[in-house]
């Protein structure tokens, strides 16, 4: 459980760490949109190369990202199986009961798996190299024009920061509860997937109670510090774009142009 990396910030001084958080959010958003346009192995290879380069620039071991993918392995596997069994087409390779496994089904399964993994990796890069408070400030800055039409941008940014901070906290709490149960003879690593899932059920009530307690503690802490919404606040750190951000935007534009060149030339 403590392998989940989304929401965890790892301090560093890498090229990605030094980028303005707004730059990283824009790059992540544009990348996810571009991923939705990928339709052949060449475009997927190009988007994968971009993520690998980003991972390299974080100066963090790839094993850190790999460990972060392990907790969602079963979700990825379930999605792949759905694509294999429910994608029609020809030629038909073999049948599994009433289901037929086709070549288009295999290709769709591979593409969905790659898309899933790449989007998770890109999102992990954002949270791994950016503190939750910086992500909230970046979101508030990017969405600030919406204040004119009454959108509570500051409150949305605060909720995002709290949610990102609570993800690793809840995972750590889950790990503590699991360790306590293991010390009493409970096993979470034996049996099939269904048995393992049933073993998780007794953990939900103490986890839910712990989450509520943390939420109450946070609410009390905010209240005693005089927190109020819908007020104008100053910032301790003012966000400003630097030369390194211009380089990042240039790289992003180059990535998008090359992507659509590949897609157009290969009739993807």
From Swiss-Prot:
Subcellular location, record wording: Cell membrane
Keywords linked to the UniProt accession: Cell membrane, Membrane, Transmembrane, Transmembrane helix, Transport
Assigned GO CC terms: plasma membrane
TM segment ranges: 26-46, 72-92, 106-126, 149-169, 247-267
Bilayer topology: Multi-pass membrane protein
Example of a GO MF term: transmembrane transporter activity
InterPro entries the record matches: ABC/ECF_trnsptr_transmembrane (IPR003339), EcfT (IPR024919)
Coiled coil: none
Cysteine disulfide links: none
Main localization (coarse): membrane
Its biological purpose: Transmembrane (T) component of an energy-coupling factor (ECF) ABC-transporter complex. Unlike classic ABC transporters this ECF transporter provides the energy necessary to transport a number of different substrates.
Subunit structure, interactors included: Forms a stable energy-coupling factor (ECF) transporter complex composed of 2 membrane-embedded substrate-binding proteins (S component), 2 ATP-binding proteins (A component) and 2 transmembrane proteins (T component). May be able to interact with more than 1 S component at a time.
Family label: Belongs to the energy-coupling factor EcfT family.
Protein name: Energy-coupling factor transporter transmembrane protein EcfT
Species this chain originates from: Leuconostoc gelidum subsp. gasicomitatum (strain DSM 15947 / CCUG 46042 / CECT 5767 / JCM 12535 / LMG 18811 / NBRC 113245 / TB1-10)
